[in-house]
Amino acid sequence: EEERRSYIQVLDQKSMRLKVLIEDLFEVSKASSGTVTLHPEHVDIISLLKQVRFELSDKMSASGIEFRFNLPEGRVILYLDSQKTYRIFENLLVNIAKYGMPGTRAYIQVVREPEGYVNISMRNVSAQELNVSPEELTERFVRGDSSRNTEGSGLGLAIARSFVEVQGGSMKIEVEDDLFRVVIRWKENAQEGKEAREGQNQERQNQERQNQEGSLGAEEKPGMEVYRGPE
């Protein structure tokens, strides 16, 4: 009876992995052929990245890797499909958690370039020396390690690249021995980016003005309540 339950459990696990494989293969095939349906909207990728980080916090902690995020203050608005972009970030962070070396650090950074592009980079140390080229890593079913002893379809990077490119961006992978780095580059919507930066500057100026007024008010009339206007 115990042996039978064990066999059933193994079959359930294999069935689930096959289901994931089929779904992932279907997704990457649609994206590669250009038949994927997009629902673009103005997305704050900083908030989205923080959401992915929160929802993967247990998996990231269990990996033994220290994830360091260097994110700009305020919003970075891009015109993207939020669900597809979430999947991109999720796949890349899960890839680090699965294949990164425990006890090392992973660095995630978002940088606005002067010429109107936004770069999202993730770099980490692989648990094993990467024995394939960057091009091969984004091919279907390639994982970059010879043991292939971890769960997954091997499609994570391929899906991420396809979803980046179908949304007008580029995804570059750099490999040197056991060092792994991926850089996503998207063009920022000029008007939205300008409005977001102006909004951030205005918020910063308002905060500085309020701090100065509060300081002056406190010096002139201690204990006086300073009216800030409607919330």
For each feature predicted by the language model, list its residue ranges.
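Short beta-strand/loop element within the Bergerat-fold HATPase_c
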Residues: 103-116
